[in-house]
Amino acid sequence: MLEMAVAALPPGKEVKAKLGRDDWLMRGFIAVIALYLIVALALPLYAMLSKAFSTYQFDLTQYEFQVSDEDGNFDGTIFSAAELNTETGAFSSEDLIAGSGDRLAVTGFFPDFSFRSPVIYKVRGTSNSVTFLAGSERLTGTEWREFDSNAFRKVVMRPAASTGLGNFTRYFSTPALVRSIQNSLVISIISTVITVSLAFGFAYSLNRSCMRFKGLFRLIAMAPILVPSLLPGIALVYLFGNQGILKAVMMGESIYGPYGIIAGSIFFTFPHAMLIITTALAISDARLYEAATSLRASRWKTFWTVTIPGARYGLISAAFVVFNLVITDFGLPKVIGGQFNVLAVDIYKQVIGQQNFEMGAVVSVVLLVPALIAFSIDRIVQRKQVALLSARSVVYEAKPNKTFDWMCFGYCGIIAFFIIGILGICQYAALIKFWPYDLSLSLNNYAFDLMDGGGWQAYRNSIKLALLTAFFGTVVVFVGAYMVEKTEGFTSGRTAFQFLAMMPMAIPGMVLGLAYIFFFNNPANPLNFIYATMAILVLSTITHFYTVSHLTAATALKQMDNEFESVAASLKQPFYKLFARVSVPVCLPAILDISIYLFVNAMTTVSAVVFLYSSGTALASIAVLNMDDAGDIAPAAAMGMMIFYTNIAARLIHAGISRGVLKRTQSWRAR
């Protein structure tokens, strides 16, 4: 009876737990860091998209003129600019399409104009919103402005702004620009196929053979991560350029163009693909191979029916990562691309070369599309890769096979020789007096203060940027990841934060840098004061590399038992004590990994900062680009190698600190 009575009770109101001080503080931290991502990422991208859809055209119906006789008398006749243009044919419809910074001289409407003439001119707009310039003076409104002939030649029209698809129409109707899309896609696909194939062979050799020196080969394979993407381009010029050591190997072909871009892309994307594929092969289940052996399947059949299916997600993920890296890279095609245009270089040419910011924004949007598609597919693939290993899985262990092991050793040796050769030729070129005429050794190429590019100050700026990025980036990323992972409830806010945290990985550095110009260079923006300072370089670098750092921190935090929070709550300890005394010490290895990741990428990045540096904040990676542009290729190679050695030193320091930290704070892991 009692059970029936209880069952008959009407449902009551849902009781929600009252939020405590810690809950509000943690949600506040999420809001603050989310605001940072909105200001540093979402709003600049919105500004760039707005610029891409902003069209400018000279509206001749908005301007009217009066012309006096030689005695300075006006007869009251009013001419519109449109009427004068129809009569004289001074400007075609294409001439009237403009950018925001373009100007149109009004003297073009008067074929007989002479600045020595005694004729006087009057100009006005047809509405109060119409503006024109008389020299540096900005004039507006419907009031007549009078000019003598000498002053009239300084009067120019400003284009009228509107919103539409005009910029995209112009882009896709320009064959040279559209060809860049095809070039970028072809180069990226070819580079991806070759790189993933080579990386798979290398990773397979490391995981499935018993060859010697695996650690050394793995170390060499990671070296390209420590140099800017421009460096392999410089090395290829010294090897296969017009005065290269191995020019004859090209058999009349030029290294400047697709061949050079593909070869250089293989070099700098190889470690990324190798790491992903190595991880995929490392989680193979030995029971599947035992089953194949018991069924008397050949090694070839086992490879295609067990190994490849087991590594398929890693291969797909590696392919899209490499594709994204190649299609968004700017430094390499800028150095060795020659006349072979690609999208990333087109952005640079439109913005720096032609000052056409609207078209630069359009190219950025076009580049954003394949990058977003590749990123989205990669994320889908990574989600499907979960739970490939079960609790009953057995880790695969390679068995000695002398012939196979030597084959793997030879293969890895060839790859290692290629990587060492690229780095070695750069160092050799940096020590040569004058290639190829005077091959005596000298340190003259390290006299950076005598070269264009920023000198040694650029190198010091890079170290400063890397240290600031590593420190502030690690703090922001880890605090943000902690708040998202450890905050209870607040599902909508945490989901929104995760979305913002994932966005930077899909945004090419060139696109982010251009977006920063539109957003932070706006005088109406209260944050305009950070433009052209070290602060904006730090901000853009942290934002550009935020996603990988966030995922690293989140992975480390997910490995911690949630009981820590429950125990702290039962002891009435505030969350910040748990954070400082437990979470940070436990996750210290991951924190150190985040800091070195940010440091190395800040030293090598080009695309994210190429639009944002000033004369006082030039960086080493930018100095490499500028010295190469100026023809100082050997000093450019020397600066590139300085970046390499700095990153090696940083890695060694990181390894030493990590080892000490593991001994002092992570001994519990071995119990």
Ranges and model annotations:
Residues G12, K16-R27, A47-E83, E87-T88, ...:
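Periplasmic/extracellular loop-to-transmembrane helix junction in inner-membrane transport proteins
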Residues T279-Y289, R299, A554-F564:
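Membrane-helix/interface signature in polytopic inner-membrane proteins
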Residues A292, A568:
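The alpha-helix within a helix-turn-helix
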Residues Y348-P370:
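Helix-loop-helix hairpin linking two adjacent transmembrane segments in secondary transporters
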Residues F330-Q354, P436-L439, V606-I633, S667-R671:
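Glycine-rich helix-loop "coupling/hinge" segments at transmembrane-helix boundaries
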Residues D22-D59, Y171-A282, G310-G331, V362-D378, ...:
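Membrane-water interface segments at the C-terminal ends of transmembrane alpha-helices
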Residues V6-L9, L60, R158-G164, L239-M250, ...:
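Peri-membrane helix termini and adjoining interfacial loops of integral membrane proteins
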Residues M1-A31, D378-I414, S492, A655-R671:
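Transmembrane alpha-helical segments of polytopic membrane transport and secretion proteins
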